[in-house]
């Protein structure tokens, strides 16, 4: 699938201290979540972008959304990973180490957005999903911003920010990665912020081929006593859709 990057929008949204330094984003990584300055910077040094990511599982959002320490702990983890890279990476990675040291850019993202909507019986793209989308990401952003300032007090601002008198441990703080593989490891949550492709499909791995079924749809089918191989076979045949299941309500069809 293609990844599309609107580079003008990216450069309008870069951190203020990078704007003041005259830094520009010229490209992204393949998956497009890493949008950091590369090439020669205002100091005449070469920068190579560094990818330091973690993703929160929105499938379990209700378990951690009100925990004031949760997001901060994840940001501490990313900061520790960044420090370890700077200290241990070989000299051949000099440009990447320099970039990491100056920016301390990390990327806290998510997976399981569609899974969260489905467990709440909220159709993807509905008014309610838009309300929850804004609420979720506003909550995460506020905690990420707070963590950056807390860590700046404890450990110092990153050099790029400190140069302009700004209290930020991290230049970039968030990034939405595809999470195609790790979402499977995390119990089959939906990938990134993407909708689930199908409710039933064959997943091919090095270990073999496996039938994957939507765990939240399974609960709905159990409610109707329809959690049978025959029903799941029909869903698979119908390209993972439930549009042909007449016993489902209109909202349930929209949700799944």
Tell where the protein language model's regions lie, with residue ranges.
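Long, C-terminal-biased catalytic regions of enzyme "large/alpha" subunits
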Residues: 1-256
């Amino acid at each position: 699938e293609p990844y599309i990057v609107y580079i003008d929008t990216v450069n309008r949204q870069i951190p203020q201290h990078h704007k003041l330094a005259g830094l520009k984003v010229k490209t992204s990584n393949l998956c497009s979540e890493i949008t950091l300055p590369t090439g020669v910077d205002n100091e005449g040094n070469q920068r190579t972008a560094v990818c330091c990511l973690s993703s929160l599982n929105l499938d379990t959002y209700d378990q951690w959304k009100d925990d004031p320490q949760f997001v901060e702990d994840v940001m501490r983890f990313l900061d520790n990973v960044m420090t370890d890279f700077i200290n241990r990476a070989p000299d051949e990675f000099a440009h990447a180490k320099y970039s990491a040291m100056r920016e301390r850019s990390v990327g806290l993202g998510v997976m399981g957005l569609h899974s969260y909507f489905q467990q709440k019986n909220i159709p993807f793209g509905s008014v309610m999903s838009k309300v929850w989308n804004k609420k979720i990401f506003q909550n995460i952003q506020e905690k990420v911003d707070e963590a950056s300032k807390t860590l700046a007090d404890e450990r110092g601002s990153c050099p790029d920010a400190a140069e302009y008198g700004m209290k930020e441990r991290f230049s970039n703080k968030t990034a939405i990665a595809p999470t195609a593989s790790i979402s499977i490891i995390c119990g089959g949550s939906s990938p990134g912020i993407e909708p689930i492709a199908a409710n039933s499909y064959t997943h091919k791995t090095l270990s073999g081929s496996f039938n994957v079924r939507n765990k939240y749809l399974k609960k709905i089918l159990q409610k109707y006593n329809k959690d049978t191989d025959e029903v799941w076979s029909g869903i698979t045949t119908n390209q993972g859709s439930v549009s042909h299941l007449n016993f489902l309500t209109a909202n349930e069809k929209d949700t799944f």
